[in-house]
From Swiss-Prot:
This is Histidine biosynthesis bifunctional protein HisB. It is found in: Cytoplasm. The keyword Nuclease does not apply. Its cofactor is Mg(2+); Zn(2+). The keyword Amino-acid biosynthesis applies. Coiled coil: none annotated. Residues 164-352 are annotated as: Imidazoleglycerol-phosphate dehydratase. The lineage of its organism: Bacteria, Pseudomonadati, Pseudomonadota, Gammaproteobacteria, Legionellales. It catalyses: D-erythro-1-(imidazol-4-yl)glycerol 3-phosphate = 3-(imidazol-4-yl)-2-oxopropyl phosphate + H2O; L-histidinol phosphate + H2O = L-histidinol + phosphate. The active site is at D8, D10. Its main location: cytoplasm. It comes from Legionella pneumophila (strain Paris).
Length: 352
């Protein structure tokens, strides 16, 4: 589904003039940073919709031709930089007209909204007034302000850099997992499980994956460590899948990593199709309190929850090194596959 930015015009795309009316070309001045910001957002796959209140178009105080000349100039200016608006909605009424189309009301967009499927969670209203925030609330989407203290650069950071995060709480009779990921943050992860070696392995995934991982996990270790490791893998897969959103612009594919005498190879495809093939032989039953049979099971559970194809092969003689190499290489593969380097969805199907 579409990710839409509903963008105000005056005070957001162009500076608001002293008399609050853009009716001559000498009043037109772009807001600081708007061009590079919109180019970044356009590259990230967002659709632009302009929605603006223009008081009294067609009246003596605001002749229609004065509005049209300035409006076309603004559109041509953005178009010259490769920035296009899919739709433009202008309310020409005054507040006294009590119309159904003036923001924060949504009447102007009703026909469009009925015909257009869009992802509300990934859509925003960007504007400079309280009415824009009310408009966002009425649409059921997010809101970001434009002001002297909240710039277009901050808007881009909020939408793109902070968007790829998710939290999962998984509580069963066997385990309690509280996990969150932020894919575009390299803060030091905080991971707490009752199996120190497993904690260390997850730290490797986050560190080499280049993302922030917060995890609090507990479970019925008096029975077996199986449930804890399995449910953690499921929660991690669900969180990464959710944080990726529509997967627009990701590499999708991703790695080979040596560790001393051990070598681990991972091929990953975040395709929406779950499959896991693990090749490796462990002759020890446990390493650091973690059953070695749970290593392939971790990857199988992750693959299922993430919706990814994962092939992994590991060789070596030191089991600690072999397992650590597996988790490190998983992190590197996720970093490569989840990174945004394209301005398209990497699939001929149009969906992942």
């Amino acid at each position: 589904m579409k990710k839409i930015l509903f963008i105000d015009r005056d005070g957001t795309l162009v500076e608001e003039p002293f008399d609050f009316q853009v009716d001559s070309l000498d009043k037109i001045k772009l807001t600081s940073g708007v061009i590079p910001a919109l180019l970044q957002l356009q590259k990230a796959g967002f659709t632009f919709i302009m929605v603006s209140n223009q008081n009294g178009i067609g009246t003596v105080a605001f002749p229609e031709e004065d509005f049209a000349v300035c409006h076309e100039f603004i559109l041509d200016l953005f178009s010259s930089q490769g920035i296009l608006f899919d739709e433009i909605f202008i309310c020409p009424h005054t507040p006294e007209d009590n119309c159904i189309c003036r923001k924060p009301k949504t009447g102007l967009l009703e026909p469009y909204l009925k015909e257009t499927a869009f992802a509300k969670h990934y859509s925003w209203v960007i504007g400079d007034r309280d009415t824009d925030k009310e408009f966002a609330d009425n649409l059921g989407v997010n809101f970001l302000p434009i002001s002297k203290t909240h710039t277009w650069e901050m808007v881009v950071s909020a939408i793109i850099n902070d968007a790829r995060k998710a939290s999962v709480q998984r509580k069963t009779k066997e385990t309690a997992i509280d996990l969150s990921v932020q894919l575009d943050s390299d803060q030091t992860s905080v991971i707490d499980t009752p199996i120190p070696f497993f904690t260390h392995m997850l730290e490797q995934v986050a560190k080499h994956g280049g993302f922030d991982l917060r995890l609090q996990a507990s479970g019925d270790l008096e029975v077996d460590e199986h449930h804890l490791i399995e449910d953690t893998a499921i929660a991690l897969g669900e969180a990464i899948r959710t944080a990726l959103g529509d997967k627009w612009g990701i590499n999708r594919y991703g790695y080979t990593l040596p560790m001393d005498e051990s070598l681990a190879c991972v091929a990953i495809d975040i395709s929406g199709r779950s499959f896991c093939d693990f090749k490796g032989q462990f002759t020890r039953e446990f390493v650091g309190g973690m059953a070695t049979e749970m290593v392939p099971h971790f990857f199988q559970s992750l693959s299922s929850a993430l919706g990814a194809t994962i092939h992994i092969e590991v060789t070596g003689t030191n089991h600690h090194h072999m397992i650590e190499a597996c988790f490190k290489v998983l992190g590197r593969a996720l970093r490569q596959a989840c990174s945004r380097t394209n301005n398209y969805l990497p699939s001929t199907k149009g969906v992942l």
